[in-house]
């Protein structure tokens, strides 16, 4: 027989959406259990950008000063090398926030920080190595989840299940939710290349006629993302590592003396880029948020921050009611109603960028700079527009959930 556990809310997935929702609900006095299938949060090539909107939330929680003591890099302006010319893209200095920068921080540090603070609330539980495999359903209502643990099976019964288990979500699959898929013509290859002290400062990446190499400063190494045509990885491997290394050097020449570190394809990880969203985020007893509700492209690094905004809206709308008992389907729909149009807007922009600008294929247009990039170069005030879209996003959330 499975072990039986009872709580008010169970959250499937200990990523940014799940951990923030768990923290906020526990802060409001709601008994909550977060179930994470892995033994720790250490994953390579996850979203590591903490945008000004998220930093503002940390300030509102009174956690910002301690949070910024964690190892991180601060980027106050996004710059890119476009067709060989360095150009500014976004200027965060005029944002109406306490922190006018993007913080680059390993996601595991962010999640460890949040979980350590959440554990201070008596109503919070975190179960690691607990993999949810199914929903518990009674009379067409989701009443909990079944999970595998090192001790055996465990049934967690709850008034609300929050699915925050990512784009390969068990919760939305078992619930029978239908997705709207948006074709994206690219995938991305992620890799590490060592960093030297005399390397040029690089905040964004290199763009050449439809192709893109993103470089993120990780202190002693570069985390590099190379955009390729959708499904094109096998063709790239067939051409061989030397040709792939040469292509990387053609974007960032200063890597010529160490690109040989990529001496095996196992050091190069494929990220299949998806943009999709659920038609319905909820049913009786279940709400999906974050990547479980809407998978984002890496473009702009907005996925983690959109997921956190979902979590804040969830706590704002549901915490008070959850403290007193179950919530209705109409209550759950309020979260989708609030968060769906920001999701649609950002996904629409990402689809446009991938279909018209970053395609992973060499473009026939060999002009020096795209017109919109020339405008950003000529008129500095225009750089505030991408800064607001990336740094704050549409409809940024603020805390309104109660405190226990």
Language-model features: locations:
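Beta1/beta-strand and adjacent pyrophosphate-binding region of the FAD-binding site
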Residues: 2-17
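Active-site-adjacent segment of FAD-dependent monooxygenases/related oxidoreductases
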Residues: 51-117
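A conserved beta-strand/loop element that lines the FAD pocket in flavoprotein oxidoreductases
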Residues: 119-133
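Conserved FAD-binding catalytic core of PHBH/FMO-like flavoproteins
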Residues: 130, 141-155, 160-273, 277-282
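Glycine-rich phosphate/pyrophosphate-binding beta-alpha loops
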Residues: 212, 275-277, 293-305, 341
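Short FAD-binding loop at a beta-strand-to-alpha-helix junction that anchors the flavin cofactor
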Residues: 282-298
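C-terminal helical "tail/cap" subdomain of flavin- and related membrane-associated enzymes
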Residues: 316-404
